[in-house]
Design a protein with these regions (language model features):
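Long, low-complexity, Ser/Thr/Gly/Pro-rich intrinsically disordered segments that act as flexible linkers
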Residues: 1-448
Length: 448
């Protein structure tokens, strides 16, 4: 198979949650399980198989309600996966997120010692995720999943997080999210950016060529690795009041507050990109999925006068802005991102923290943990060398400590914000493997 050959994904073997878009509106639940008995764990997988849908079966995500199952390295061990198979997984996955925390910048209040237990501990074996466009459909699909692990003494629920779309349809900071997902070749999901070709399937699903033209390393045997992928789960607490206070202190009007927030994020609250509408929000553009992601940076905004190079959106996906830098290929560092909110919304205009826990449960999907998630987090989110600002990190989700800065290009004189505090705190996370359906059957039928 040549590097330019278009592959056909075996969608009937790929868990739907790997490629399917998040419904909108949505409600969801994440459940973590511990396997105390090997046979009970395998029995649970056999029961779960009929509940799990394959592939992005609907072009309308509002119609979908689905469940996905994922396993940690410790979970695979608990199921009795042979040592040679365990050794074939990515080293980052084997170590687990807690062991990689320092590399990821999760230290101090963001470090594993401060995480919400059992996140980041060896007790986390299985992760279930359910997303639905309605509470009724979620309850139905959750009940089907619940029957798979109840009445099994050797399987224990150890954690649960419920999520739902806020009444505004936006994230806790007030911004529309879920925009700018990469197009995956062969997935059947239409691309939202006509200026970028779809990414090779092997960037996201194991068993297919990636952007280098090679097959990514895959767990063995082939039945276990093929059509699987890696998944990163993280829970973030958001300091919404601190974010609003910072904007208020650095702006002279509500209009300037909105502009500063947009400069930090890279989009207006409606989702409209600064690159296309730099001066004022355009809700109609923000609501149009055929236009709100259809842009590049190199020709239109290379210097960041519209959308700062250090903004959150541009750090997560620099698009073509780095094409003159031969040391980096942005297409090797893309991820499928899926965020869901938890906790109550802080009422509009409130500047004081009410003490409620609110935030985002984030999922990142990709075939390469190290050069996708870990690279983006350590090199683009937590560092600014690649944009010529080595002392700056992501103004919204970076590990700022009250001394952070953020540069806003402007003619004739740039503006630099000072004293950035932390607006996001890591509450925990884990690395998972999302097996294909045949792999789940293989795991369920393992012999001791």
């Amino acid at each position: 198979m040549t590097a330019n050959a278009i592959v056909e994904l075996e969608l009937d073997d790929i868990q739907g949650g790997a490629l399917r878009e998040r419904p909108s509106p949505y409600v969801g639940t994440y459940v973590l399980l511990r396997i105390d008995d090997q046979q009970a764990g395998r029995q649970m997988l056999r029961r779960l198989l009929p509940v799990i849908d394959a592939g992005p079966t609907s072009s309308d995500p509002a119609k979908d309600a689905w469940v996905s199952v994922a396993l940690t390295y410790q979970g695979l061990k608990a199921l009795g996966v042979p040592p040679d198979s365990l050794a074939s997984f990515a080293p980052e996955f084997v170590q687990g997120m807690a062991a990689r925390a320092e590399l990821l910048g999760d230290v101090g209040e963001n470090g594993p010692d401060s995480w919400e237990k059992p996140l980041g501990t060896p007790e986390v074996h299985v992760g279930l995720a359910a997303l639905s466009p309605s509470a009724e459909k979620l309850a139905t699909v959750l009940e089907r999943a619940r029957r798979a692990y109840t009445e099994l003494p050797g399987v224990t629920v150890i954690w649960r997080q419920d999520c739902y779309q806020l009444p505004t349809g936006r994230n806790p900071f007030g911004f529309k999210d879920g925009i700018g997902q990469p197009a995956v070749e062969g997935s059947g999901v239409p691309r939202s950016n006509s200026k970028e070709p779809p990414l090779k399937a092997g960037e996201f699903i194991l068993g297919y060529p990636d952007e280098t033209g090679s097959l990514p390393p895959m767990p063995k045997p082939e039945v276990l690795g093929r059509n699987g992928t890696y998944l990163v789960f993280q829970k973030f607490h958001t300091r919404v009041a601190a974010y609003r206070q910072y904007l208020r202190a650095n702006a002279s009007s509500l209009e300037e507050e909105a502009l500063l927030g947009a400069k930090m994020v890279g989009r207006w609250q409606s989702g409209a990109p600064l690159t296309l509408c730099p001066d004022r929000d355009d809700p109609e553009l923000g609501a149009d999925p055929s236009r709100n992601n259809d842009f590049l940076y190199y020709e239109d905004d290379l210097r960041g006068f519209n959308c700062p190079a250090g903004s959150h959106a541009r750090r997560m996906n620099p698009r073509d802005a780095l094409k003159d830098d031969t040391s980096v290929d942005v297409r090797l560092h893309r991820m499928i991102r899926r965020g869901t909110t938890y906790g109550p919304m802080l009422p509009e205009g409130v500047l004081e923290d009410d003490g409620a826990d609110r935030g985002i449960a984030f999922v990142f999907v990709g075939a390469h943990l190290k050069r996708q998630f870990e690279f983006v987090k350590s090199q683009w989110v937590n560092d600014g060398i690649f944009i010529g600002a080595s002392q700056e990190n992501d103004p919204l989700v970076g590990p700022n400590d009250g001394t952070g800065t953020f540069t806003i290009p402007h003619r004739p004189i740039r503006r630099r914000l000072h004293g950035l505090p932390s607006f996001v705190v890591t509450r925990g996370g884990e690395y998972f493997f999302v097996p294909g359906l045949r792999a789940l059957r293989w795991l369920a039928e393992l012999e001791t």
